[in-house]
Amino acid sequence: QLYKVLVVTDQKTKDKLYKESYYQSQIRDCSHLFIFCSYKNVESKHIDEFIDLMEQARQADDERGYIDKVKSKAKIMLYGTIAKADIGRRDKAEALHWMQKQCYLAVSQLMVACADMRIDSCPFEGFSTEAYDKILDLGDKNLTSTVLLPVGYRTEDDRHQYRTKVRKPIDRLFEEKK
């Protein structure tokens, strides 16, 4: 989980971000604005933090025997070594691209959760990353804004809710390869 999620509910902050989102109303009107931020540079400590969390979670299972605990610890250590090696082989741009894709996976899960609760959400890329990073003071935190997800309930007078959604037909979107 080489990303961080900021949750903005403050209207003044949303108003500032609205201007840097090409005046798209969902940014200003949402109840919660989730901003998924990827690290600009991955460091060993980020992986170590996750490994520590994994180890703590696995130690909570007191019913395992000693051998199982040793095997589990070895697997966790191996996972950490592999993760560090995988990130280490990538150049900075490739690592950033990979971390940004992790944000999109998380956004999709939040969208599914929102839909399950009948809360509207709308993923956004249309914003100035540089401006968001400055407004949210992300520069000193080794983070950069990657993708936005405003969530909330639409108003009854939302004129877009009745417009026909335009999507590619299934037969043009999916192609079976044998």
Annotated model-derived regions:
Residues 1-178:
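Acidic, surface-exposed loops and disordered segments
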